[in-house]
């Protein structure tokens, strides 16, 4: 489910994937090729949350911000060579 909150609509890149029962609220941005898995909640009701390119948030995760603490930014994972 995707929810607007106080005039803020989540920004979801068309190349990202969101599980059918994930919840995304407010000031959340999903970059290209990001994945949000089952039973996950991203609550951007207070401050922004950015999930970077090629990143994923695994099953059952809850990410929420506190007032006045800028943002949460999950960036591309390190890849082994």
Residue ranges and their predicted role:
Residues 9, 48, 70-71:
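Short, structured helix-loop boundary elements
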Residues 26, 44, 59, 65-67:
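Residues on the solvent-exposed faces and adjacent turns
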């Amino acid at each position: 489910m995707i929810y607007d909150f106080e005039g803020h609509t989540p920004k979801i890149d068309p190349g990202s994937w969101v599980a059918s029962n994930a919840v995304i609220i407010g000031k959340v941005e999903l970059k290209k090729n990001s994945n949000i898995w089952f039973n996950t909640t991203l609550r951007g009701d207070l401050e922004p949350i950015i999930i970077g390119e090629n990143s994923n948030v695994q099953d059952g995760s809850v990410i929420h911000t506190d007032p006045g603490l800028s943002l949460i930014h999950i960036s591309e994972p390190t890849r082994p060579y």
